[in-house]
Regions:
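Soluble, acidic/polar mature domains that operate outside membranes
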Residues: 1-404
């Protein structure tokens, strides 16, 4: 009995040891790797990063460093990327820590969203490659399923409270290696090139400074909303007899195109057909609205012009141009101002318009075309018939009945 018992103990111990080896080999990193950075040397050379390539099943794009500083999106004709967003991304990659080793079986890749996007059209993975100025790989990995911060079981207390809200765990694979690692860090891998662009506040004119907005289209009369003084409501001009404004909000929506406008995509203005350019149906007033423009006039007599064009697929885009106030707008004496003395010369110089604001806006807008959300394009293309309705005749009917 003792010999048999001893044999069973040996067998059980061997089984437990095998199970422990199997568990550690699959679900825990070796002690010398757990908590180690996935790319231990990256942070020290991070300033040498010159390109970030992100590939998914749906898209592939490159963020590239500019010699003058900052970053740009190559597939958007070099439109500026948000430097802070790119920097946060690079620091996020450099800060990824190994938490555990998972499977090496390719049959499990799909479950972890780690099939290669180049080979699987349904892949949910994102391939990330960071390159130096010579094109060499500084870091490369395939990112799969993400556990958001709310699902992270044991966040590292050493990261501090400020870092916990952005903490997540990601299943990753390194190039030419079958092993899947679970890593942890503050990394958000945005999947669209426009996610790295600041798309907010394309226009930012203070509402109180706007005097009027006029929309001109090739197939209809101009549509204009205006007000006499700051703080007043905007009024729709040239309403036909017997008609009235449906509601004030629609006029405010038109003005808001110049107050706080967000765009969805950007391309070179050369890629878009504008009025009199290309073979676009520039006078048909169709969905694209080639030839349509909206002009915002400010109380200081500066203005912003928004022109609408369309791409090869007929989708509408806009471009913008700012113009400073004319010199007379700042002159107190008008055309009769004397210029005989030094004082008059100083007055004329002081009357020169401030062009800094217009120059700043044109630097931001020049050469670019912007795609707006659909509801913004709808606002821009809204006609007079959509803004007015027949006047309420209830009072008149009441008078007739009283007179009868």
């Amino acid at each position: 009995m003792r010999a048999k018992t001893f044999t069973w103990v040996l067998l059980l111990s061997a089984a437990l040891a095998g199970a422990a080896w199997y568990y550690l080999g699959r679900d825990a990193a070796p002690p010398d790797l757990q908590g180690r950075l996935l790319f231990p040397d990256l942070r020290a050379v991070l300033t040498g990063a010159r390109a970030i390539e992100i590939t998914t099943a749906d898209d592939s794009f490159t963020l590239e460093s500019l010699e003058a500083g900052g970053w740009a999106v190559r597939e958007r004709h070099g439109y500026p990327a948000q430097t802070a967003t790119v920097r946060r991304f690079l620091l996020g990659v450099a800060g990824l820590q190994i938490r555990s080793r998972k499977t090496s079986n390719p049959d499990n890749y799909a479950r972890l969203d780690l099939t290669a996007p180049e080979d699987d059209s349904g892949s949910k993975a994102a391939r990330v490659v960071i390159r130096d100025e010579d094109g060499g790989e500084m870091a490369a990995f395939l990112a799969g399923r993400i556990r958001p911060a709310s699902e992270v079981d044991n966040p590292d207390p050493d990261r501090g409270e400020s870092g916990l809200k952005d903490l997540s765990q990601i299943f990753v694979r390194l190039p030419d290696a079958p092993t899947v690692w679970l890593v942890e860090g503050a990394l958000d891998i945005a999947r669209q090139p426009t996610d790295y662009i600041n798309r907010d506040r394309l226009t930012d004119t203070p509402r109180n400074s706007i005097r009027s907005v006029t929309v001109a289209r090739p197939d209809a009369d101009d549509l204009s909303v205006t007000r006499a003084a700051q703080g007043e409501d905007f009024e729709l001009q040239n309403i036909a007899a017997g008609m009235q404004l449906k509601n004030q909000f629609q006029l405010n929506d038109l003005v808001d195109l110049f107050v706080n406008l967000k765009f969805e995509d950007v391309t070179s203005a050369d890629e878009i057909a504008w009025a009199g350019v290309g073979d676009g149906n520039s006078g048909d007033g169709g969905a694209g609205g080639i030839g349509l423009s909206a002009t915002m006039f400010a109380f200081d007599k500066s203005r912003v012009v928004m022109e609408q064009g369309e791409d090869a697929e007929g989708k509408p885009w806009i471009r913008l141009h700012a113009e400073p106030p004319p010199p007379a707008a700042n002159s107190t004496d008008g055309e009769n101002a004397a210029a005989d003395s030094a004082e008059d010369g100083d007055a004329a110089e002081s009357a020169a318009p401030d062009t800094s604001r217009a120059n700043e806006l044109n630097k931001r807008w020049s050469g670019w075309a912007f795609q707006l959300p659909d509801f913004r394009h709808d606002t821009l293309n809204r006609g007079m018939d959509e803004l007015v309705e027949a006047e309420d005749e209830a009072d008149g009917d009441g008078d007739d009945e009283a007179g009868g």
